[in-house]
Amino acid sequence: MLRMEPLNSTYPSAAASSSPLESHVPSNSSGNGNEYFYILVVMSFYGVFLIGIMLGYMKSKRREKKSSLLLLYKDEERLWGEAMKPLPMMSGLRSGQVPMMLNMLQESVAPALSCTLCSMEGDSVSSESSSPDVHLPIQEEGADDELEETSETPLNDSSEGSSENIHQNS
């Protein structure tokens, strides 16, 4: 085989090694250990950096959750406080007089309301039993009965296999 000689002849061509490619590759056996150590150091820095980011994110989420729960609690407390407020005091009335006045108002309004409902029911019942309303549905039913009789007659005559036609023919 042919061997290529390097252009720069600073290396002895045949004295140091048997092939020219092996002479250009550095042979540091201790360099491999340093490379692994360098990779380990860089990866550990990345790991510490990522763990710091994760912890900061988790801490901010925990704070956000606590603050939102606190805000939710305060909102609900405010709503319950508004709902549980006592009735506003009227001028010159004590709090014991207000419910008594409401009871009296209910007692006077309830009979009037029931009478109004009864009179409305009476009006609707009387309108249902009035003569024009009653005659109109009866007239419609009568018209429907006449239509059914006229429609049945041609069907029986035109149907050849009906039982009536068979009895009439025999």
From Swiss-Prot:
Q: Which residues are glycosylated?
A: N8, N28
User: Acidic residues compositional bias: what residue ranges?
Assistant: 141-151
Q: Membrane side Cytoplasmic: which residues?
A: 57-170
Q: Where in the cell is it found?
A: Membrane
- Is Protein transport among this UniProt entry's keywords? no
Question: At the top level of its lineage, which domain of life is listed?
Answer: Eukaryota
Annotated Gene Ontology cellular components are:
apical plasma membrane; voltage-gated potassium channel complex
Q: Describe its function.
A: Ancillary protein that functions as a regulatory subunit of the voltage-gated potassium (Kv) channel complex composed of pore-forming and potassium-conducting alpha subunits and of regulatory beta subunits. KCNE4 beta subunit modulates the gating kinetics and enhances stability of the channel complex. Associates with KCNQ1/KVLTQ1 alpha subunit to inhibit potassium currents.
Family note:
Belongs to the potassium channel KCNE family.
What's the protein called, per UniProt? Potassium voltage-gated channel subfamily E member 4
Gene that this polypeptide is encoded by:
Kcne4
